[in-house]
Amino acid sequence: MFVSSPLSLFLTAIALPILLLLLHDGPASLLVEAVAGDDKENQIPLHNFIGELEESIGFYQAIELTNDGDDGNTNSSLLYSKESQYQQIEVHRSKHFGKMLVLDDVVQLTERDADSYNEMMAHIPMFQHPAPQRVLVVGGGDGYVLHEVLKHPSVEHVDHVDLDTDVIQTCEQFFPQWADGWKDSRTKLHIADGAKFAKETPSETYDVIIQDSSDPWTVDEDGVVIPLPSGVLYEKEHICALYRILKPNGILNIQAESFNIPTSLDGIIIWRKLMEDCGFQRSRYGTIHTTSYPTGQIGFLMAEKNPSGSISSKSKDIWKRYQQMIGESGTEDHNKRTTYYHPPLQRGCFDIPLWVHQKIYGQEDTSDLFCQLDVENMDQNNDQDENENENIPVVA
């Protein structure tokens, strides 16, 4: 006779919920009950997951939520729920990732790993520009990208445009650690459509534009691509409007999905072509490791308007500006430190797998696309630049 061991009970508790998740049709909040045997004393507790299915690659991402209600309430992880004019807004509590913002059943950020996406979306374009003073942030209703942008001392003004005021109010309540940007005197918040705002903005207004939008489309169970409200932010008319309102040497950075998902990889190629058609140069795809997003990877497309000079000459300046931002060694401003971004990623994030590089760039000569960030030449112990770099930190 087979006797259930603790290991077999554990495997049942894990495997069965995942199997049930894989049988689910699409992105949704899921409550899954796993039971090992008929004996009530050996019954495995309820497991509460939220997951998203990527049918094109047969991949299901699931995060376990808390279930600490004494009454057995499987919704005890739900801290907040509201249907706004545009979407269903939820805040959940998870076991590993802390509080999570969920829009229309799709995880947007978690307290545990939101730093990776938001720091990269903000600091890569901000440090790429030599002295960004005026910045436009489109989307990013959680406030995290804005929070990071305002760490840069050169910033004089930020226009933050988001469509859904309910998302902003929700994040002010549940994620106050990132909501300080809206109280900063340099920020002007606009509750408006991002495409309409860009269309009505005068030419050559901004040094940097960051578009932190939600997914532009989804794919149903039959493989049909369904446009979502953010899709307008990825159309040629809007991309060209962003080009127009950037100053010369301006930087554009847009959220560009995961290269692991075929429809998203196709989108990266399309959006990059749109950027070039609108006049942008040096458009390139950067990668970010974010555990809570499908396949654990997401990326961005960054491009420049009429770039002048060699971007490789800025590498040492990036280190100096980074040190100025976070404060001198031993006296760092804890509110301005980063936990994911550091200057080597200014170049390193564009190092992508060969097959992805070939898919995005084809036979194109990409030698001019990437900043040659030579970490060795910026090492404070480098004899050649010892005097010049004596105050530049070395990040391990």
Question: How would you label these PLM feature ranges?
Answer:
Residues 39-90, 295-385, 391-396:
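SAM/dcSAM-binding transferase cores
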Residues 259, 290, 307-308:
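Conserved beta-strand elements of beta-rich interaction domains across eukaryotes
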Residues 255, 280-291:
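Conserved S-adenosyl-L-methionine
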Residues 29-38, 190, 389:
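N-terminal, immediately post-signal peptide pro-regions of secreted/luminal proteins
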Residues 92-94:
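Short beta-strand micro-motifs enriched in acidic
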Residues 39-61, 84-86, 97, 108-254, ...:
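The AdoMet/dcAdoMet-binding core of the Class I SAM-like
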